[in-house]
């Protein structure tokens, strides 16, 4: 969880932790809160996020002709670059890739580099083609579209994510901006496997490409409901798993 909180610092300054979420749910005894939490960590919600992302390209962009000194790109040219040449770049990083392409083209033709000040002006022109680059707001659109309570519309300093939203927002961040793959990690060990959700395993599989050892006891969980992760792990890891089930305990309890 601490890793997720650090990754989200540029989006929200604070996140509810797992234990505060459990305590809040126990106090309120609200079945809907528990169900909503499980829904947002599920395979179905990942599907909703992917559907939302598929339509976001058109809703998030406001293309316009770029003209700055010798750099000139029409709206039509930018649309073609966005949807074809750079279609595989993450959505919120795509205009940066197009900007670099245009700047490189200009600098090659004129034989000189743009200054830092000029590059900032060009970057600002490209950034203005996004309706917003604020992932907090974009996640709010997703919640509204899916029929969930929306996030408070507040400035950065007053934002706080409930625990149920932490990993959906992290997933959205990685899909929109790209993710760092931790290639220096050679083997990952995950304990208490039963306390990780479908969505958490999807994120782990995206950022760690090494072999993993995943350990746990499905009968021991922080959640009220028992979660058998072995039901979905083969799908997350494309069947590339070797399962060992130990039916006898060697634990000594004093």
List the predicted regions and their residue ranges.
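Conserved helicase motor core of SF1/SF2 NTP-dependent helicases
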Residues: 3-11, 149, 154, 173-187, ...
